[in-house]
């Protein structure tokens, strides 16, 4: 079985090398343009995607954020594209192709179509049909694999500057929709995100936010658990447990003595999970007006030493 799998793998890589050469030929001789294949793909996606964003390009093409950013800036400098701030969310910018960009794109498309036709001209109709069917089958089979990979959840233990605004918005949205908290909670989030962040774990699936948890340094031996949230689309899959496992393991490795968190008594969903990991209530405040509700704050502690 192992030998057969290795044989398939070798054939797969051999085909990849062959098709990479075909793509290189297309890019060098067919498109006959100063753009690389990746640049051409990015221009194609911007042209054909309504309200395209840099994040959408990253997700669709599987490209690094910095790489996409450099190409977008280059295109902007060359007057191929322009950005427009979203009316709904000022943090987001949509990318559009300029008239110059449209002219260049259409020329690339025309040239590509002409030269692909010339490439196929030496292949008879029967073989062309077989080729098209084989391509469709390859696409269908590999799409299943890619779809399965995209549904997997990965957890990263670092954060980017734009992640902070995303976490604030996810927290605000969840507590507003599920618990009716008002905008004073948003103000609280924005103020406290300037705290001494020790670590943040962010769960993602197919480029989509799935959950998060973080730590804020309280003193040399104590950290506070913050920003614990699992997106509604990913609940019931054990993600909350995984996030807390990462957090507790990190705290043990760093030799912290204590983890604590503040929550409110109405947070029924997370309480069993906190108890499972050994957190215990250490302080309960009197019910008071908070974030547009009457809430009872609780402090939970986990002793590690």
From Swiss-Prot:
Domain HTH marR-type: from-to ranges: 1-140
SMART domains per UniProt: HTH_MARR (SM00347)
DNA-binding region: 54-77
Pfam families linked: Acetyltransf_1 (PF00583), MarR (PF01047)
Keyword presence, Transcription regulation: yes
Keywords of this entry: Acyltransferase, DNA-binding, Transcription, Transcription regulation, Transferase
Alphabetized InterPro entries for the sequence: Acyl_CoA_acyltransferase, GNAT_dom, HTH_MarR-typ, NAT_camello-type, WH-like_DNA-bd_sf, WH_DNA-bd_sf
Record-linked Gene3D superfamilies: 3.40.630.30, Winged helix-like DNA-binding domain superfamily/Winged helix DNA-binding domain (1.10.10.10)
GO molecular function per UniProt: DNA binding; DNA-binding transcription factor activity; N-acetyltransferase activity
EC number(s) given by UniProt: 2.3.1.-
Enzyme's top EC category: transferase
Ranges for domain N-acetyltransferase: 153-303
PANTHER family: GNAT FAMILY N-ACETYLTRANSFERASE, LD18367P
Function: Putative DNA-binding acetyltransferase.
Protein name: Putative HTH-type DNA-binding domain-containing acetyltransferase YbfA
Gene source species: Bacillus subtilis (strain 168)
Gene this protein is translated from: ybfA
């Amino acid at each position: 079985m192992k030998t057969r799998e290795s044989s398939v793998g070798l054939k797969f890589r051999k085909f990849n090398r062959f098709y990479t050469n075909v793509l290189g030929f297309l890019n060098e001789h067919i498109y006959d343009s100063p753009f690389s294949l990746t640049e051409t793909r990015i221009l194609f996606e911007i042209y054909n995607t309504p309200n395209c964003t840099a994040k959408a390009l990253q997700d669709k093409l599987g490209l690094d954020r910095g790489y996409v950013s450099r190409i977008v800036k280059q295109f902007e400098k060359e007057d191929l594209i322009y950005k427009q701030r979203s009316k709904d969310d000022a943090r987001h910018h949509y990318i559009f192709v300029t008239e110059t960009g449209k002219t260049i794109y259409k020329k690339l498309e025309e040239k590509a179509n002409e030269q692909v036709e010339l490439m196929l001209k030496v292949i008879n109709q029967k073989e062309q049909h077989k080729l098209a069917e084989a391509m469709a089958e390859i696409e269908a089979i590999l799409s299943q694999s890619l779809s399965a990979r995209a549904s997997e959840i990965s957890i990263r233990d670092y954060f980017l500057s734009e992640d902070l605004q995303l976490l604030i918005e996810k927290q605000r949205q969840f507590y507003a929709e599920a618990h009716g908290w008002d905008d004073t909670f948003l103000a609280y989030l924005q103020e406290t995100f300037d705290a001494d962040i020790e670590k943040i774990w962010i769960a993602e699936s197919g480029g989509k936010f799935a959950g998060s948890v973080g730590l804020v340094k309280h003193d040399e031996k104590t950290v506070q658990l913050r920003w614990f949230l699992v997106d509604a689309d990913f609940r019931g899959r054990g993600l909350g447990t995984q996030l807390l496992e990462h957090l507790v393991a990190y705290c043990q490795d760093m030799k912290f003595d204590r983890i604590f968190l503040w929550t409110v008594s109405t947070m029924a969903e997370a309480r069993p999970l906190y108890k499972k990991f050994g957190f215990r209530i250490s302080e309960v405040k009197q019910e008071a007006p908070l974030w547009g509700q009457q809430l009872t704050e609780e402090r939970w502690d986990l002793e590690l030493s």
